[in-house]
Amino acid sequence: MSAVDIEKQLYFQWCAFITNPQHHDIRLGQWFSIHYLKAEDSVTHKFWNATTLEAQRYIIQWLEDHCYTDTLPPKIEEARYGN
């Protein structure tokens, strides 16, 4: 599995996570840091201490930077534009 395949797999896992109402009370940054950023201590620290909204914005920016914007599901689109 290539690095791109792994990124895509993690991205879709994250999409499933954020769109599942059972998980809305869990800090997205915590989940994201565990799955994406284990080796980047300073970024991981930021995620562990982020509020859900801050984490959402940071993650959405990361997705935009990595060209995933054409496939964002509706709930992420809503968060992206603050709806």
Please provide the spans of the model-predicted regions.
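N-terminal acidic leader/helix
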Residues: 2-30
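Acidic, low-complexity, intrinsically disordered interaction modules
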Residues: 21-65
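Low-complexity, intrinsically disordered short peptide segments enriched in small/polar/basic residues
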Residues: 1-3, 15, 56-57, 73
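Hydrophobic transmembrane signal anchors and adjacent membrane-proximal interface regions, especially
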Residues: 12, 16, 34, 42-45, ...
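Short, structured coil/loop segments at alpha-helix boundaries
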Residues: 4-7, 39-41, 69
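Charged low-complexity stretches with an acidic bias
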Residues: 54-83
